Amino acid sequence: MPREVSWPMWAMFITATYALAGWSAYSCATSFDDPLSALFMASSGVHFVIWGNFLIVHYCLFVWAIIRVLFGQLTAIEYDHIFERLHVVLVTLASIVITMRKTYMAGHMTILFYTLCLVAHWVLRDRMDFVFQVHGTDSSLLGILCSRFMFSLLVLGMVDYKMLKFCVQNTNVDGKRHDLYLMLALSFAQLILDVLHVVLLTSLNLFEMVRSRRTRSANLVYEGGTTDDDADDEVFILEGKYIYETVFDLTITVLKVILDIIQEVFVPWSITVVYSIFVRSIKAGESFLLVYNYWKNNKKLYEKLSDVSEEQLDDTDSMCIICMDDMLPTTETTKMNRRAKMLPCGHMLHFGCLKSWMERSQTCPICRLSVFANDSNSHATTQAREQTPPDLLQERGIDEHIDVIGMQDMSVQSISLHEGTAVRRGTTGNCMNQAYDGGLLSHEERDQAGWVAFPIEFRADNKVFFNLNDSQGDRQWMASYTSYPRQNMVNSDDPDNASESHSRIPSPSLPGSLEGTSSQVDVTVSAKDAPANACFVIATSKLEQTKEVEHLKRKVEELESRVEELSKRIKTDQV
C-alpha cells in the first residue's frame, strides 16, 4: 500500500464497511417480510450508499490481489503513478456508464475489467524501467526472460487479445450495433499497442545489456583478466537509444490517435476522446521535431566540433560533466566516443557523452548555449548587415557602445561604433592599439600584457556579438552586448568636447563571472586613431576566477545529481 495509507487504516475501513453492510442487511430483512421489498429498500437511500461502498471496496481488493499476483510488491513510484492517472480514467468511465445506461450489464462489467487491465498496464510499464535500472547489466539474459515481469507481459498480451476478440464479436449482434462494445474494442486495441511498446523497449534494453556484457568480457581479455582498470568497468551504451525510444513512442502515439479518431467517428461524441486526440497529437508533434532536429544537426557532428589539445585540458577542469570521468587528449585515446570535443561555448565533453546528451537537447549541458550557434551566427551576420544600417539606428536615437574593461593599472576605453570616436584614459593605450591592429596577440604577448582582447563578430537586433578567447588556450565563449538609447552623444565633428559630453556606459553582457564594470572616460581620441576592428579587453585574472567558479559549479552539479539519484533510490525502495 502507499505510504499515505497504512494497513491499520485499511483494516479499520474494511471492518467498518462490513459492519455497515451487516447493519443494512439486518435492517432491510427485519423491515419487510417480502424479499423484493427488502431488496428495493437496500437499493435506495443510505442503504444504497452502504452497498455501493461495499462493492467498491471488494472490487479494489480484487484489483490489488490480481496486481500482487502479477507483479508482487509494488514500489512507491508505481503507486504514485497509479493514483496520478486513476482519477482521470474514473471520470471518463463514469461518463461512459452514465451516457450508456441502457446497455446490458455485461457491458458495464467489461468496463470494470478494462479498468483492471489499464492499471496493470501502467504497472507493467513502470516495472520494465525498474527491472533494467536496478539490475542493469548484472542480471543474466535467462533470468530476465524467466522473470515475473516477462510472465506478466505475456499474460497481459493474451488477455488483451482475448478481450479485443470478445468485444469485436459483440459489436454487432442481430444486426444491431452496440457502441459500448465498439468503444471497448478500440480501448483494448490501444492496450495491445501499449504491450507492443513495452516489448519494443524491452528488446532494446536486452540488446544493450547483451552488448554491454560482451564488451566487458572483451575488455577483460584484452587487459589480461584484471578488474581494476577503468576499461574493464566500461559498459556498452547503445548509440541513439533515446532516439529509438522516441521513434517507438511516436509510432505508438500516432496509431493511438488514429484509433481515437475512429472512435470519435463511430461512437457518440465525447469530450474526453477529443481531449485525448488533442494531447496525443501535440505529443507526437514534439517527438517528431526532436527526431528531425537530431537527424538534421548530428549528421556531421564530429567534423563540426574541434578536438581538445593537451594544453587546453591542462588549463581547465578535465572532468566530463556528464559521465564525471576525466577527459584525455585525442592522441591518448583510440575510441572516438572517448575523445574530448570542444563546443562553440568553450565547454569540453566526451564525444560519446555529447551524442547521448544531444539526443535530448541541442544545447550545451553546462551553459545551455546552442551547440550549433556558429552556423546561425553566419546567417545572422548577413541578415544584420542588411536590416540594421547605421542610418536607421541614427534615426531611432540608438547608440552602440563597447566598454574595454581593464584591471588595476589597465584603463577603460569606450568606442562608439557609428560615431567614429574613441575615448581612452591611462598610459597603456599603445599596447591596446597594437592588439587592435594585429587582431589578437600571441600567447607570449598576452601573458606579458596581462589581458586578452576579444574581436567583435557581428551585430543583430541592437546587440553586438563577439567571441571571448582564453589567453592560455583556444577556449571560446559567445557573448552579446545590447545597445541602449543615446543619452549624451559624443559629437564626432567636435572631439574636443567629447570628454565633457560623455556619460557612463553600461557594461557588456558577459557570461558568468566574466561580466565586468565600466567607468567614465576622460581623454578623447580622434576617429583616425580609433581601431578598425573594435575589441573587448579584459584582465586574465578574471579568466582564472572564471575557471575556479566553473569548477565549483561542476562540483555542485555533481553533488546535486548524486543527491537526486539517491532520492530516487530511496523512493523506489520505499513501499
From Swiss-Prot:
The keyword Endoplasmic reticulum applies. Residues 26-46, 101-103, 160-179 are lumenal. It is found in: Endoplasmic reticulum membrane. Pfam families: zf-RING_2. Residues 486-520 are annotated as: Disordered. Pathway: Protein modification; protein ubiquitination. GO terms for molecular function: ubiquitin protein ligase activity; zinc ion binding. Residues 1-4, 68-79, 125-138, 201-575 are cytoplasmic. The keyword Methyltransferase does not apply. It is an enzyme of class 2 (transferase). Keywords: Endoplasmic reticulum, Membrane, Metal-binding, Transferase, Transmembrane, Transmembrane helix, Ubl conjugation pathway, Zinc, Zinc-finger. A zinc finger (RING-type) spans 320-368. CDD domains: RING-H2_synoviolin. One of its GO terms (biological process) is protein ubiquitination. Its EC number is 2.3.2.27. It catalyses: S-ubiquitinyl-[E2 ubiquitin-conjugating enzyme]-L-cysteine + [acceptor protein]-L-lysine = [E2 ubiquitin-conjugating enzyme]-L-cysteine + N(6)-ubiquitinyl-[acceptor protein]-L-lysine. The chain crosses the membrane at residues 5-25, 47-67, 80-100, 104-124, 139-159, 180-200. Signal peptide: none annotated. It comes from the Eukaryota. It is a multi-pass membrane protein. InterPro entries: HRD1_E3_ubiq-ligases, Znf_RING, Znf_RING/FYVE/PHD. One of its GO terms (cellular component) is endoplasmic reticulum membrane. Interacts with HRD3. Belongs to the HRD1 family. E3 ubiquitin-protein ligase which accepts ubiquitin specifically from endoplasmic reticulum-associated E2 ligases, and transfers it to substrates promoting their degradation. Mediates the degradation of endoplasmic reticulum proteins (ERQC), also called ER-associated degradation (ERAD). Component of the HRD1 ubiquitin ligase complex, which is part of the ERAD-L and ERAD-M pathways responsible for the rapid degradation of soluble lumenal and membrane proteins with misfolded lumenal domains (ERAD-L), or ER-membrane proteins with misfolded transmembrane domains (ERAD-M). This is ERAD-associated E3 ubiquitin-protein ligase HRD1. It comes from Eremothecium gossypii (strain ATCC 10895 / CBS 109.51 / FGSC 9923 / NRRL Y-1056) (Yeast). The lineage of its organism: Eukaryota, Fungi, Dikarya, Ascomycota, Saccharomycotina. The gene is HRD1.
